[in-house]
């Protein structure tokens, strides 16, 4: 969508239309829910058609095509729930979703519901009074095992919920590692100076613009995030030009058989966040109803 204005400045609308409305009508579909506009989705042939239209004045290149970047190795770390917790998750999901009519789900309600399932996977959840209820240590144990395997190498940890951060801090307090929560430029400087072993970061607070490549080569996502853009930009805090390392490692802690796997599938497909969350939730509701 942002491409129209850039091309208009070059050709005054000759290739992509004289105004943004023409561009949208030609290359996008307006999504609605319950009669209300939600967002725009590119038509199936939008990308190749647009690229062909502007090919005589533009060249499309990925950063890795023209920059010297380290190799980026992404991998998933399977987290297995014990039998007791697995049954509790299944019951929690049923109780949460079976009361919902999949035909009336909105992007907002889907985000809230999948957020609760992601919290369960992480090991704690906010109750109706916004108090934290601890559920299990399966993911935190897997995280600490991963940190131990790094043998002291610095690591950026992306967390999703405030209770994730607090439980991670409690677990790391039992080690001799120097741990910081990212709060601003001072932490960026300390990280790049090699004075932080584990830097806890919420993805929305530093996914853009920060140069952290000098301080380490490891990233771990404690809580998978639906947004491909946030994942991609988070990775680029270390995977960027000027890194002193030849490899950068990005790990994802993924609870098996649960919503974590749906999030990872969405990231790999690079699909629209809101639409994907709604589709995944509807599929889970339909599956549960089919089991009754």
Predicted regions and their residues:
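Conserved Helicase C-terminal RecA-like lobe
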Residues: 68-213, 271-273, 278-292
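Alpha-helical scaffold elements adjacent to nucleotide-binding pockets in ATP/GTP-utilizing enzyme cores
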Residues: 2-6, 22, 26, 53, ...
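A conserved SF2-helicase RecA2
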Residues: 226-292
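Conserved beta-strand segments of the P-loop GTPase G domain that flank and frequently precede/overlap
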Residues: 158, 201-202, 221-223, 253-254
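Conserved nucleotide-binding/hydrolysis micro-motifs of P-loop NTPases
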Residues: 14-15, 83-85, 163-164, 205-207, ...
């Amino acid at each position: 969508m942002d491409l129209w204005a850039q091309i208009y400045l070059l050709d005054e609308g000759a290739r992509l239309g004289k105004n943004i409305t023409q561009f949208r009508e030609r290359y996008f579909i307006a999504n609605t829910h319950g009669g209300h506009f939600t967002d725009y989705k590119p038509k199936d042939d939008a990308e190749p058609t647009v690229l062909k239209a502007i090919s005589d004045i533009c060249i499309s290149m990925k950063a890795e095509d023209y920059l010297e970047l380290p190799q980026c190795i992404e991998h998933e770390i399977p987290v297995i729930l014990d039998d007791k917790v697995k049954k509790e998750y299944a019951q929690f999901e049923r109780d949460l979703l079976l009361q919902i009519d999949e035909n009336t789900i909105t992007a907002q309600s889907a985000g809230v519901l999948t957020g609760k399932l992601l919290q369960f996977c992480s090991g704690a959840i906010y109750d109706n009074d916004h108090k934290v209820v601890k559920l299990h240590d399966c993911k935190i144990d897997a995280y600490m095992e991963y940190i131990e395997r790094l043998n002291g190498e610095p690591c950026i940890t992306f967390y999703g919920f405030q209770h994730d951060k607090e439980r991670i801090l409690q677990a790391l307090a039992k080690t001799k590692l120097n741990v910081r929560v990212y709060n601003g430029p001072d932490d960026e400087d300390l990280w790049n100076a090699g004075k932080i072993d584990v830097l806890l970061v919420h993805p929305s607070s530093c996914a853009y613009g920060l140069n952290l490549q000098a301080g380490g080569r490891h990233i771990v996502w404690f809580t998978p995030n639906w947004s491909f853009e946030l994942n991609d930009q988070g990775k680029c805090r270390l995977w960027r030009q000027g890194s002193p390392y030849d490899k950068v490692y990005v790990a994802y802690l993924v609870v098996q058989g649960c919503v974590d796997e749906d999030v990872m599938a969405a990231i790999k497909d690079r699909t629209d966040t809101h639409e994907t969350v709604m589709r995944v939730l509807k599929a889970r509701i339909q599956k549960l109803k089919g089991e009754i």
